[in-house]
């Protein structure tokens, strides 16, 4: 987990540094930090229905994300509507990082 956390932090720091370096050339640099999403890779590993339900419950929105959700975020950052956004990390996780793990009522 140490290598994963360190590399994720490095990508975020690199995004900010590159935004500063390339901003004067009108080049925007942003980062997308996806949360757990349902993809063909997950499907091929035969994630159990219970596992998928646990991931859905971890989302504040109560839905399961897909690769399309990540793609839509990237498309937004590439669009003219994001012309004033640079050096930012857009977390696309349905709010999963806003709260701790889902708990069963006691």
Task: Label the model's feature ranges.
Residues 13, 31, 50-81, 85, ...:
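C-terminal helical subdomain
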Residues 20-24, 83:
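Alpha-helical segment proximal to the catalytic Tyr-Lys
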Residues 75, 86-106:
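Short C-terminal tail/terminal secondary-structure segment
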Residues 4, 12:
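Catalytic tyrosine of NAD(P)H-dependent dehydrogenase/reductases that use a Tyr as the general acid/base
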Residues 25, 30, 88:
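Rossmann-like NAD(H)/NADP(H) cofactor-binding core
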Residues 7, 15:
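Active-site helix of classical SDR
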Residues 1-3, 26, 41:
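Conserved catalytic loop/helix region of short-chain dehydrogenase/reductase
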Residues 33-44:
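Short, flexible catalytic-loop segment of classical short-chain dehydrogenase/reductase
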């Amino acid at each position: 987990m140490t290598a994963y956390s360190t590399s994720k932090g490095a990508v975020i720091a690199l995004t900010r540094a590159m935004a500063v370096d390339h901003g004067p050339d009108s080049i925007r640099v942003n980062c997308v930090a996806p949360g757990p999403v349902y993809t063909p890779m997950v499907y091929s590993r035969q994630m159990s229905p219970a596992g998928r339900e646990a991931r859905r419950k971890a989302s504040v929105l109560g839905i399961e994300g897909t690769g399309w959700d990540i793609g839509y975020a990237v498309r937004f950052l590439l669009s003219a509507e994001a012309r004033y956004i640079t050096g930012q990390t857009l977390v696309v996780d349905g709010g999963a990082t806003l709260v701790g793990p889902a708990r069963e009522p006691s």
